[in-house]
Every structure is written in structure tokens, then in C-alpha cells.
């Protein structure tokens, strides 16, 4: 959806894609064995969808752990508690399902304040990863000759 793309536009590594590619990605997710329609929450206002929380049944082989795959709020609606509400709703659902814990991955340098949100709801850092990346775009020669 457009709302999902806009919510992640300022996320590390974001690259925009045509709507048909986004639809295809959603189809792939929805056919995954980890997908559950009851683990998707939307925040809406008079303009439409302004926030989304997509969770998966479990985190890989960790069957007792739920996984927050994608949590995002449109920039104009950030800072009013929507992400917190969406996140706490998923925690309650996982607790109902008997999960022992919930995990997610986050860009620790996110300009959105995501790490403050997660620590504010009681989550803590269990693993820190540093990724190195070189962005290569078609038509841009980066080789030093």
C-alpha cells in the first residue's frame, strides 16, 4: 500500500518500487507459512491508513517467540502514540497465544526514534549487528581505474 511505502520512506535502506512490485511482495508474504491475517493491525483516520503493524506467527525456529516484521506510522502522524498502541496490541495478542517473548529488528540509528519506542515498552537490546553496504546504482561507475 502507499501508506506502508510512505511510512518507511525514511527507513535505512529504503528504495521505492512500483505499486505492482509492492503488491507482489505482499502476495509473497501472505502465502508464507508464518503469515496470519489476525496479526496485522492498521491505524486509520479520516485520510485513510496512517499506521501498520505486520507481525508473523513466530520468529524463524523460535516457535515460542512472536515477531514484529513491519511497524510503521506516516510521518505526519508520528509522536501521538499510534506506533506504541499498535505494538502493545500485538504484545497482547502474542500473550493470548502463549508466546514467551516478542522480537523485532530495528535500525539503531533510525531518525524516527524507534529505539526509544521499543525501550519505552519494555523491550531491550539482545543483539547488535553492524552491516556494511555499498550502494550500486545502474549507470554510476564507482570503480577507481
Description of each model-found segment:
Residues 78, 87, 102-105, 118:
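Hydrophobic multi-pass inner-membrane translocation pores used for secretion
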Residues 75, 104-114, 132-137:
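Conserved beta-strand-loop-alpha-helix junction that forms the acyl-donor binding cleft
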Residues 43, 77, 81-89:
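Conserved acetyl-CoA pyrophosphate-binding loop and the N-cap/start of the following alpha-helix
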Residues 80, 84, 109-127, 140:
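Conserved active-site alpha-helix within GNAT-family acetyltransferase domains
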Residues 12-71:
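A conserved beta-strand-loop-helix scaffold within acyl/acetyltransferase catalytic domains
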Residues 65, 94-106:
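Conserved GNAT acetyl-CoA-binding A-motif
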Residues 1-21, 144-145:
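Short amphipathic alpha-helix that is part of the acyltransferase structural core
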Amino acid at each position: 500500500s502507499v501508506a506502508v511505502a510512505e511510512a518507511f520512506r525514511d527507513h535505512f535502506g529504503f528504495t521505492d518500487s512500483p505499486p505492482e512490485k509492492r503488491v507482489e511482495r505482499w502476495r509473497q508474504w501472505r502465502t508464507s507459512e508464518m503469515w496470519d491475517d489476525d496479526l496485522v493491525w492498521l491505524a486509520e483516520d479520516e485520510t485513510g491508513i496512517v499506521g501498520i503493524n505486520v507481525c508473523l506467527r513466530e520468529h524463524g525456529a523460535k516457535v515460542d517467540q512472536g515477531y514484529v516484521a513491519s511497524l510503521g506510522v506516516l510521518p505526519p502522524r508520528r509522536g501521538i502514540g499510534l506506533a506504541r498502541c499498535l505494538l502493545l496490541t500485538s504484545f497482547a495478542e502474542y500473550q493470548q497465544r502463549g508466546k514467551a517473548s516478542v522480537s523485532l529488528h530495528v535500525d539503531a540509528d533510525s531518525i524516527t526514534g524507534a529505539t526509544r519506542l521499543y525501550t519505552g515498552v519494555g523491550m531491550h537490546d539482545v543483539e547488535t549487528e553492524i552491516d556494511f553496504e555499498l550502494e550500486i546504482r545502474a549507470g554510476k561507475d564507482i570503480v577507481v581505474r
